Amino acid sequence: MAQLYFYYSAMNAGKSTALLQSSYNYQERGMRTVVYTAEIDDRFGAGKVSSRIGLSSPAKLFNQNSSLFDEIRAEHEQQAIHCVLVDECQFLTRQQVYELSEVVDQLDIPVLCYGLRTDFRGELFIGSQYLLAWSDKLVELKTICFCGRKASMVLRLDQAGRPYNEGEQVVIGGNERYVSVCRKHYKEALQVDSLTAIQERHRHD
């Protein structure tokens, strides 16, 4: 039986690398995969999933108006799909997560979703909220804070490198804009208005 998987983490935990490896594993066995990524995130070019270690794959784009079940069913009828993989799945809508569950339940195709659990305010993304609620399997991909603890929070930095937790939920950016930290240092960085000061304090402890 196919299942719906949600692989979640903070930033820079290797989600895209894990997705590309999973897709390759299917393809190596002669199976066909379909990869999706969010249209909104074009840091590495539109229409592809790229990892920080240099791997990449062509990808279909989804936005808030995409009818994923209809798209996947139509393509599956033309040529069998053995696995659907979705990068940046935090940007899915509630309806799209439901449609992906229908891909699993009605078409018997496994769906593997990779994305962030929470935003820079520590609040769930809509896509992540419903994947946490409806997935068959939840898998945490771990990364670490500068202190060595598990990083479960994401700090957003302004142009001067200061952390802040106000503004729009979605602002696309990489390491210059976001950094993954543990909960303790997330709170401390916001309290003192400086990630650098917290890092310096930790080095001297």
Swiss-Prot record:
It is an enzyme of class 2 (transferase). GO terms for molecular function: ATP binding; identical protein binding; thymidine kinase activity; zinc ion binding. Allosteric enzyme which is feedback inhibited by dTTP and activated by a number of dNDP and dNTP. Disulfide bonds: none annotated. The active site is at residue 88. Belongs to the thymidine kinase family. This is Thymidine kinase. It comes from Escherichia coli (strain K12).
